């Protein structure tokens, strides 16, 4: 009967632990869903893992979008899967914090007689510290949840940035092909004129050099596209046949109405999960600080029962008590260490807040500068280049300029288009970095994990 009861108790503890683990990761997953529109999946050998694998394969069969690439990473990135285990470790710490230490049983048998001495001791002081330890461990669990959530959001932003970087490199590669074709045509025309004796050696060499440079630029652009594709492969965690995904080769246009950038610094301070994690770490440290010194002194306080049986058969039973005497170590080192750790966490919190504000300003300025370049290029530079092409075509038809001049003007137009695409790529990459710096959406309702009202500074 006792064995059955023990088994039931262990089973109940396991079920409660699994339920708490699901709830903890569910909090993180829901926050990620609200901030990214995508749900994270923790692969732990559950039936949901098989469904996630099927969904992953279906995503990779279709042309990838930024959102689809983020979803692939949340399902398949192994570094993220390793990060998810931090929640399991922190949850185990909560369970351990709620358990009493095992009692100690000692027995002594003296030969050749029948004298027997037995003692059962337990650290009774653990019962007093149990609630405080659990509160501190729960604060550390909340910190772990926030750290995991921050890593997920960081990875999602990195995937978006890598996606737009690769998409831009593909588009630049297509323009590089046009430049190379124009340079090849110009070099071929120069060769024919040179063979007919109508152009100088210097002119032919110049056109051939321009063609060679265009080929080098094209090779460099293609190498960048391969490199950015591998970067995206790594972030999504794909390999083998999974890397045969496709993607649209053109960047999307920037939104007509740019999002407001006022208040982004304050928004980042409110919703950055790594900052929330530091708040909970400091809260856990503050909760444990109050009893750490007393625990250091009283941790050897033991109470129990003592049994002695003498040789003639007489025996005696009575209580046993062991009390440490704090003559030398009365917890001063533990207290100083705990206070230093708390101050350290407070300074890290303040330092991270300063860094976050700086990151937001830098990413915001990069995004706005790139947007200004895109708008100026589309409204002024490209239309002007188009007019120059039209005028040059008319002059070429009237035999007022040479074919080389016409091809040169065409190359300059393509180069202007390349600069516009680079600015467009930089805009989307900077926007993804700004979302990472802000810790989520750039507008709308502030979204947070459930937080304690207590903060690092006790406000």
Features from the language model and the residues they span:
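Short segments within alpha-helical structural elements
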Residues: 184, 213-240, 348, 353, ...
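Long, charged alpha-helical "stalk" segments
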Residues: 46-47, 83-85, 226, 278, ...
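Periplasmic alpha-helical coiled-coil/stalk elements that build and connect Gram-negative outer-membrane
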Residues: 3, 132, 139, 146-267, ...
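Terminal intrinsically disordered/low-complexity segments used for targeting and assembly
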Residues: 1-72, 222-267, 435-459
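A small-residue-enriched
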Residues: 19-40, 67, 71-126, 229-238, ...
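Amphipathic alpha-helical coiled-coil segments and their boundaries
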Residues: 66-69, 76, 83, 123, ...
């Amino acid at each position: 009967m006792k064995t059955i009861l023990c088994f039931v108790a262990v089973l109940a503890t396991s079920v409660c632990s699994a339920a708490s683990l699901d709830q903890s990761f569910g909090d993180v997953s829901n926050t990620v869903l609200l901030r990214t529109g995508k749900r994270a999946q923790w692969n732990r050998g559950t039936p949901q893992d098989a469904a996630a694998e099927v969904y992953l394969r279906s995503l990779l069969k279709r042309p990838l979008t930024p959102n689809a690439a983020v979803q692939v990473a949340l399902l398949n990135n192994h570094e993220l899967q390793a990060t998810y285990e931090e929640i399991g470790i922190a949850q185990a710490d909560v369970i351990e914090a709620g358990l009493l230490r095992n009692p100690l049983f000692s027995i002594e048998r003296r030969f050749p007689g029948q004298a027997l001495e037995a003692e059962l001791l337990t650290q009774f002081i653990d019962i007093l510290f149990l609630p405080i330890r659990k509160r501190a461990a729960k604060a550390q669990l909340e910190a772990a949840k926030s750290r995991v959530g921050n890593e997920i959001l960081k990875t999602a932003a990195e995937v978006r940035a890598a996606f737009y970087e690769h998409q831009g490199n593909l588009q630049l590669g297509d323009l590089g092909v046009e430049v190379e074709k124009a340079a090849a045509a110009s070099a071929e025309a120069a060769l024919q004129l040179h063979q007919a004796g109508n152009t100088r050696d210097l002119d032919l060499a110049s056109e051939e050099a321009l063609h060679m440079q265009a080929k080098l630029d094209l090779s460099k652009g293609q190498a960048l596209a391969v490199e950015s594709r591998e970067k995206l492969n790594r972030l999504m965690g794909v390999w083998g046949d999974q890397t045969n995904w496709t993607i649209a080769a053109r960047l999307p246009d920037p939104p007509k109405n740019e999002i407001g950038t006022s208040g982004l610094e304050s928004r980042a301070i409110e919703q950055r999960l790594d900052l929330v994690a530091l708040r909970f770490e400091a809260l856990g440290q503050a909760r444990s600080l109050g009893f750490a010194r007393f625990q250091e002194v009283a941790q050897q306080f033991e109470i129990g029962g003592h049994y002695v049986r003498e040789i003639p058969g007489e025996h005696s039973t009575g209580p046993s008590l062991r009390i440490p005497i704090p003559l030398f170590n009365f917890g001063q080192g533990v207290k100083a260490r705990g206070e230093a750790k708390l101050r350290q966490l407070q300074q890290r919190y303040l330092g991270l807040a300063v860094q976050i504000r700086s990151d937001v300003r830098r990413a915001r300025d990069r995004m706005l500068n790139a947007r200004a370049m895109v708008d100026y290029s589309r409204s002024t530079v490209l239309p002007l280049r188009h007019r120059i092409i039209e005028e040059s075509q008319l002059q070429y038809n009237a035999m007022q300029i040479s074919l080389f001049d016409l091809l040169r003007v065409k190359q300059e137009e393509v180069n202007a288009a390349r600069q516009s695409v680079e600015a467009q790529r930089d805009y989307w990459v900077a926007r993804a970095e700004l979302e990472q710096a802000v810790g989520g959406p750039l507008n709308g309702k502030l979204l947070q994990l459930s937080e304690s009202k207590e903060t690092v500074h006790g406000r």
